[in-house]
Amino acid sequence: MATSPQTDPQHDDRPLPQDFETALAELETLVAAMEDGSLPLEQSLAAYRRGVELTRVCQERLAQAEQQVKVLEDGLLRPLDPRALDDE
């Protein structure tokens, strides 16, 4: 049996990674575990839920990077305010 992606199959209390690369790596690990078919149903559902959360982290980081590129393309070399993304 593959190692469990979490100890509690119903809920994962681990904090979400805040950087894109770590979130993507964890997501890829979860997908591989689910694809090999060795996880019991409850662990598969928990892995799916965690995967959705990780996907959201990745999407948010990509949106932030895209916004920074747009700012740089406009010649405005200033840090991006992440709160500006919440308004969209």
Curated annotation (Swiss-Prot):
Task: List keywords of the entry alphabetically.
Answer: Cytoplasm, Exonuclease, Hydrolase, Nuclease
Q: What class of enzyme is it?
A: hydrolase
The UniProt record lists the keyword Nuclease: yes
Instruction: Give one GO molecular function term.
Output: exodeoxyribonuclease VII activity
Q: Which Gene3D superfamilies match?
A: Exonuclease VII, small subunit
BP GO terms, sorted: DNA catabolic process
EC numbers listed for it are 3.1.11.6
- Major place of residence: cytoplasm
Q: Which InterPro entries match?
A: Exonuc_VII_S (IPR003761), Exonuc_VII_ssu_sf (IPR037004)
GO CC annotation: cytosol; exodeoxyribonuclease VII complex
> Which reaction is the catalytic activity of this chain?
Exonucleolytic cleavage in either 5'- to 3'- or 3'- to 5'-direction to yield nucleoside 5'-phosphates
The UniProt entry, under SUPFAM superfamilies, shows: XseB-like (SSF116842)
Write out the annotated subcellular location.
Cytoplasm
The UniProt entry's sequence similarity note says: Belongs to the XseB family.
Its biological function? Bidirectionally degrades single-stranded DNA into large acid-insoluble oligonucleotides, which are then degraded further into small acid-soluble oligonucleotides.
Self-association and partners: Heterooligomer composed of large and small subunits.
Q: Which PANTHER family match?
A: EXODEOXYRIBONUCLEASE 7 SMALL SUBUNIT
Q: What is this protein called?
A: Exodeoxyribonuclease 7 small subunit
